[in-house]
Regions:
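Catalytic cores of RNA-modifying enzymes
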Residues: 1-145
Length: 145
């Protein structure tokens, strides 16, 4: 059994009902997908069953990045990198659907970076992200509260 590394803010997605809800939020078929922090690949497997044209996985944990090779096919490219240093815009000329069960310790920073860059370079079509409840509460809070 793989244990989540708290130092990397890992939290593995294992609930099939939640995975199904995530999958059903957007049309995956024939689209390019970026998954941030795929972890053990539970969401990855379901995305692949929905036939994306290409899929990019960014996983900082080298052990997990290596283990993901067992569940992928020719449509998938794995990047063993830190998403905060990763150049998402270099992946494709097409708009990409982003999925992420974001690492809790950097989720706010990732979202802030992507939203800040929206006005300059709109590289994704959809963001389907999971956050820790406390992070989600901060995101939807009124300004200056």
């Amino acid at each position: 059994m793989i244990r989540a590394k708290k130092s990397l803010g890992q939290n593995f997605l294992i609930d099939k009902n939640i995975i199904d809800k995530i999958i059903n939020t957007v049309s995956i078929t024939d689209n390019e997908i970026l998954e941030v922090g795929p972890g053990t690949g539970n969401l990855t497997k379901e995305i692949l069953r929905n036939n994306p044209s290409k899929m990019y996985l960014v996983e900082k944990d080298s052990f997990l990045a290596e283990s993901l090779k067992e569940i992928i096919d020719e449509r998938v490219k794995i990047f063993n990198e830190d998403i905060l240093k990763f150049d998402e815009k270099s992946l494709s000329k097409n708009k990409i659907i982003v999925f992420g069960n974001l690492p809790y310790n950097i989720s706010t920073e990732i979202l802030s970076t992507w939203i800040t860059n929206l006005k300059n370079d709109y590289w994704f079509s959809d963001l389907v992200l999971m956050f820790q409840k406390e992070v989600a509460d901060r995101i939807i809070a009124k300004f200056n509260t």
